[in-house]
A protein has these predicted regions:
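Hydrophobic alpha-helical segments within soluble ligand-binding/sensing domains
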Residues: 91, 150-173, 186-188, 214-217, ...
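Segments of small-molecule ligand-sensing domains
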Residues: 304-314, 325-383
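An alpha-beta-alpha
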Residues: 44, 147-211, 230, 324
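Extracytoplasmic "Venus flytrap"
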Residues: 36-58, 62, 82-89, 111-114, ...
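Beta-alpha junction/loop-to-helix N-cap segments that form part of ligand/metal-binding clefts
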Residues: 37, 50-57, 69-141, 150, ...
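Extracellular/periplasmic periplasmic-binding protein-like sensory domains
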Residues: 244-318, 330-331, 375-384
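Extracellular/periplasmic bilobed ligand-binding domains
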Residues: 123, 188-283
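Periplasmic-binding protein-like
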Residues: 98, 102-111, 131-133, 175-178, ...
Length: 386
């Protein structure tokens, strides 16, 4: 019996020693860095999926790149991606969920200006940083101090295509077409209109449509009768392509030039428009052929993952992640929503793949970078002649 008690005590001492040793090993091992939780709400279905899907793909490439690096000091991005369905009500529901349930440090998105205008006041009320991925309306970032934008404001870049049309193409008269129920498209039209008027270009027609419209024959008939040198379209990619096809079918003068906004830079524009969109001129946030190590790395990674060349939306999604990571880095250790917001405000002359390669926020937290004038040639997007 005594021998048995001694054996049990010896076993207990051995077990205690093993437990202590294991505890020492665990204490010596560095703790895993906590993930930084970010919400992302994008239009993966519905009206704005044409830009929401590629921006999500660009987002994924950016997340993989950041998480493979030591940019955040061992921390990783945990991005919760949800579909808004191109619906404002769903977009509002998601930002509330990201804030309250998921305790996200910030939110990326949404895809459209109509969704962005809807959720921007909510972001300010909740005091959670919001960085739009592809929504362009100035009303979004001007809604309050918690909202930032990745794409440049219409007033900054849209004027460039109008100036190009007047100075390089000799356009003296223009017809304007835009989506009246989309704040971003209204802003794009207004920016182009202001530039055209400043150059004494004659505005021969101003026609608005709904973003859901697919039959433009009545509008086209009016435009043909007005005999413009060019038609400026502030519409989504599919609508723009459909409009141009119908205009060609209706017999618009082949000499009429079609001018547009960054939406033209979607693969859907060429896929749907085909030969009808040859020669279209637009201002772009991005050109995949731009030189530079980061862009080449992005294009290579995107092509490897999706077997195609990234478009405007993909580049904006990727850039949004890189800007978000820079804000987190600038927020310091143990970031909070307040310090992340401060991190956004610290961003100056940030290298990006957009425009001419340098990004800043203006005083209203809108994006600033130079656009690139592009055209469609032989079924591909290429820089327009200088």
């Amino acid at each position: 019996m005594v021998m048995k008690d001694m054996a049990m005590k010896k076993l207990a001492r051995q077990m205690l020693g093993l437990t202590f040793a294991a505890a020492c090993v665990l204490a010596a091992r560095p703790a895993l860095a906590e993930d930084y939780v970010i919400g992302a709400e994008l239009a993966l279905t519905g009206t704005y999926a044409w830009v929401g899907v590629p921006s999500r793909e660009g987002l994924d490439v950016g997340i993989e790149e950041v998480n493979a690096s030591d940019l955040l000091g061992g921390h990783k991005l945990k991005v919760l991606i949800e579909d808004t369905g191109s619906d404002k009500t769903q977009a509002i529901s998601l930002i509330n969920r990201f804030s309250a349930r998921d305790k996200a440090l910030m939110v990326l998105g949404p895809s459209s200006s109509s969704e962005g205008v809807a959720i921007a006041p909510v972001a300010n009320e909740l005091q959670i940083p919001l960085l739009t991925t592809t929504a362009v309306s100035e009303a979004i970032n001007k809604s309050g101090p918690w909202v930032f934008k990745t794409p440049a404001s219409p007033a900054l870049v849209i004027g460039d295509v109008a100036k190009y049309a007047v100075n390089k193409m000799g356009v003296k008269s223009v017809a304007m077409v835009w989506g009246r129920n989309n704040d971003g498209q209204v802003g794009q039209k207004n920016a182009a209109l202001e530039t055209f008027k400043a150059s004494n270009t004659k505005i021969v027609a101003e026609e608005s449509v709904l973003t859901s419209d697919t039959d433009f024959l009545a509008v086209i008939t009016k435009i043909i009768a007005a005999s413009p040198d060019a038609v400026f379209l502030a519409l989504v990619a599919e609508q723009s392509a459909t409009f141009i096809i119908q205009a060609r079918q209706q017999g618009i003068d082949p000499a009429v030039k079609f001018l547009g906004v960054p939406n033209f830079g979607s693969d859907q524009f060429i896929l749907i428009g085909g030969k009808a969109v040859e020669g279209a001129i637009y201002v772009a946030d991005y050109f995949a052929g731009t030189a530079g190590e980061e862009n080449q790395r992005f294009v290579e990674a995107y092509r490897k993952k999706y077997n195609r060349t990234p478009d405007n939306g993909a580049a904006l999604g990727y850039t949004a992640v890189k800007i978000a990571a820079a804000a987190l880095r600038g927020a310091g250790a143990n970031p909070t929503r307040d310090s992340v917001r401060d991190g956004f405000l610290k961003i100056k002359d940030f290298p990006v793949i957009l425009g001419r390669g340098t990004f800043n926020f203006d005083n209203d937290r809108g994006a600033r970078y130079e656009g690139v004038i592009m055209t469609v040639k032989n079924g591909k997007f290429v820089p327009a002649p200088e």
